[in-house]
Amino acid sequence: MHFINEFINRGYFYQSTDLTRLTQISNSSQIVAYIGFDCTAQSLHVGNLMQIMILRLLQQCGHKSIVVIGGATTKIGDPSEKDKLRRIITNDEIQQNISGIKRSLKKFIKFDETKNDVLLLNNQEWLDSINYINFLRDYGRAFSVNKMLTMNSVKSRLERHTPLSFLEFNYMLLQAYDFYYLNKYYNCNLQIGGSDQWGNITMGVDLVKKLSNNEVFGLTTPLITNSSGEKMGKTADGAVWLNEDMCSPYNYFQYWRNIEDNDVIRFAKLYGEFSEVELSKLTELFFNNVNEAKKQIAYKITLLCHGRDEANKALNTAIQMFEHKKADENLPTFTIKDCNNLKVGIPITELLVTIGLAKTKSEGKRLIQGNGIRINNIKVNNINLVVQLHDFIDQVITVSLGKKCHILVKIAK
């Protein structure tokens, strides 16, 4: 399996520096590629999933890859695709986020230092110790401010007259230096990132060529949206996280189960690692029974993230909920310990906050008014509804937010 050919066939390709030469090198020798993740949250999400699948593909094709966690660059903040200055994230938050991101990555990837396992690095290791004066003297001459001002991440902010701090302006220098450092000490010759990173990546390519004259490449992926134009991993309820403490395996399964018909085959190629034979069968199934095809995709993608046991539980729970119309014990569960409250009753908005489906009672009201809440699969229309003991069947009710998020609410025995 040739890396670039498979990369293009799956739909990962957007733009590249010297694609012909990169293809030749990747077909004839082992490349060393790096992908970076900044530490802005305690988990990666579905929007990061393509980059993770690319890391797996590199490994499967016999290439070496490096994951760089941006412990240092997160302190600065990437201005790409941003309309305003990022909130400064504290060092403690960054360390917590690094821990969570490592958990996300280890679900999919084996980290080691053997021939084609993935190496995990943190750019704090080399950026935190940089002397600013020395950095300007040694590397500042290699960067053109004229070119930096033409970068989309900078240009768009200036055109909209939105603030761009000198702090953020430095981000692209540090990312370029990351590539130079990785090339010098790890023989890294390829950086892969999203299409919004093209300017930062090409600056890194130029820096390496100017300072060492080594042959390096940049490769970017497209921004993936669904058929409605929404970014992958974004829902009305927030991001779809990869870590199970932030998004249960069942809700993760449901996200994929509820994709639009037009996205089924495309997402199978992007995220499912289906073989050609499997994809052919899936395509045939899609035209005969689209819902069954969606279940197969949801199962496969959940299996890759959460393992076979959790994927089986999620599939069985979905079948019980939507085909047999029964609540399933494998749903995320909240237990009410004091049933005396239920004798008087709990306002629905208070219950939504208590079980974590709404952050505030006001948000709970908005969800109800938007027809987003169901109890035991019956739509809640009354924002003043009081949930009482008689609403529970065998001491259980199912509270649902939209089609994808379900909580089993139990009364403690």
Curated annotation (Swiss-Prot):
Belongs to the class-I aminoacyl-tRNA synthetase family. TyrS type 1 subfamily. Coiled coil: none annotated. Its EC number is 6.1.1.1. Catalyzes the attachment of tyrosine to tRNA(Tyr) in a two-step reaction: tyrosine is first activated by ATP to form Tyr-AMP and then transferred to the acceptor end of tRNA(Tyr). GO terms for biological process: tyrosyl-tRNA aminoacylation. The lineage of its organism: Bacteria, Pseudomonadati, Pseudomonadota, Alphaproteobacteria, Rickettsiales. ATP binds at residue 234. Residues 346-411 form the S4 RNA-binding domain. Pfam families: SYY_C-terminal (PF22421), tRNA-synt_1b (PF00579). It comes from Orientia tsutsugamushi (strain Ikeda) (Rickettsia tsutsugamushi). A motif ('KMSKS' region) lies at residues 231-235. It is found in: Cytoplasm. GO terms for cellular component: cytosol. It catalyses: tRNA(Tyr) + L-tyrosine + ATP = L-tyrosyl-tRNA(Tyr) + AMP + diphosphate + H(+). One of its GO terms (molecular function) is RNA binding. This is Tyrosine--tRNA ligase. A motif ('HIGH' region) lies at residues 39-48. It is an enzyme of class 6 (ligase). CDD domains: TyrRS_core. InterPro entries: aa-tRNA-synth_Ic, Rossmann-like_a/b/a_fold, S4_RNA-bd_sf, SYY-like_C, Tyr-tRNA-ligase, Tyr-tRNA-ligase_bac-type, Tyr-tRNA-ligase_bac_1. Homodimer. L-tyrosine binds at residues 34, 171, 175. Keywords: Aminoacyl-tRNA synthetase, ATP-binding, Cytoplasm, Ligase, Nucleotide-binding, Protein biosynthesis, RNA-binding.
